Amino acid sequence: RQSLRQAQRPVCSALEQVNLAPAPVKSVPELVEGPMLPNSQRQHRLDYSADIVIVTTGGSPKLSGLGFLEALNLEIIPPIPSLFTFNIPGSPVRELMGTVVENASASIAGTKFKANGPLLITHWGMSGPVILKLSSYAARYLADNEYSVSLSVNWLGDSSEHEVRDRISSLSKDNPQKLILNTHPSELPSRLWAYLISKVGIREVSRWAELGSKGMNRLVNTLINDEYLIRGKSRFKEEFVTCGG
């Protein structure tokens, strides 16, 4: 795999640009109108003049790394993590680590932050594309709430309550004498289904004919609005991606 620096070299060479990485920038003072100062070199320092300076802040995970811009009176948004997984300490769902649901919907309760995609249950909580997308959409909100919020999961993607109720009712009518444990929506792994029906108080030996309206309501609600308490975050791979700057 080619690094970003390697990819930039041919372009810099063609444009006769100089790559000084990893030399730090000490300051970017704004010059008064007039002729540009010539480039100069002093001990341990290079001075450059330019009509335009483009600053890309992705490499500064801390606000202190942007201190060289303070003299320009720019609004600097504090960098915060924006691509991470969710910690759900103490939840029995973590016992399903390695379980994947290919199309789930996840949202932050009480907000409009929502994402869809594959969800992975881990030994610390939840991960996968849907969680990473949600963490990026809600990065500032999560930071403001110290990564302590309620996560709502719809295990059947964007399916509405009406659609899920129809599906579960059909399963019940078509399989009255079969065990609920052994008959479930094809999208849901068997281990997850067993966990969900146990969570709503359905016994492993219960049959569909025994479910009843209250059991149906609890099951449907859990399938479309399964809530977990997020308590912290974990790195995605080796680094936190940040937003802000």
State each model region's role.
Residues 52-62, 81-84, 111, 126-127:
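Short acidic/polar capping segments at secondary-structure boundaries
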